Structure formats: structure tokens, C-alpha cells
A protein has these predicted regions:
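Glycine-centered, phosphate/nucleic-acid-interacting loop/turn motifs that mediate DNA/RNA or nucleotide
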Residues: 55
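Residues within the helices of the helix-turn-helix
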Residues: 20, 31, 49
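Short amphipathic alpha-helical interaction segments
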Residues: 39-50, 66
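Short acidic, hydrophobic short linear motifs in intrinsically disordered regions
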Residues: 27-36
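Hydrophobic residues on short alpha-helical segments
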Residues: 15-22
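Short, cationic-aromatic polyanion-contact patches
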Residues: 4-15, 29, 59-75
Length: 75
């Protein structure tokens, strides 16, 4: 499989920003990503879906609030 850097190359700037935010901040909810990146909720959702397609981001259910998902960089 190609490196994360190679998989990031053809993604939109919003996806790269979300990736870098997760790299710097660690695990975040979508709401936290919206706040940190200052992107719209819709744009963050799209960026996350693109990152998941490239297997760069993983999601899991939050233990504090099962309605929320936590996103982190894939290992």
C-alpha cells in the first residue's frame, strides 16, 4: 500500500486540513474538527468521507456520548 503522503496528494485542501488537524490535535469529534479547522460541517463531513475512502482516518463511537463518533488517524 502507498504511504499516507502519497494517498493525501490527490485529496482536496479541506481533507488535507482535517488530516493535519487530527495529526496535531489527536482524536476529535466532527464538531471539534469544525471548530479547529473553521470549515463548515458539510465540508468536514465530506473531507472525513474522502479520508476514510483512502484509509487515512478511522472512526469509533465515543464512550462519553454514543451519538458522537471520534475520528483519528488510521494506524
Amino acid at each position: 500500500m502507498s504511504s499516507a503522503k502519497e494517498r493525501l496528494e490527490d485529496l482536496p485542501p479541506s481533507a488535507k486540513l482535517v488530516y493535519k488537524t487530527l495529526e496535531f490535535e489527536g482524536e476529535c469529534t466532527q464538531k471539534e474538527l469544525v471548530k479547529e479547522t473553521r470549515l463548515s460541517s458539510r465540508t468536514v463531513r465530506y473531507a472525513i468521507s474522502r479520508l476514510e475512502e483512502k484509509e487515512l482516518v478511522e472512526q469509533r463511537v465515543s464512550f462519553r456520548d454514543a451519538r458522537q463518533k471520534l475520528y483519528s488517524l488510521a494506524e
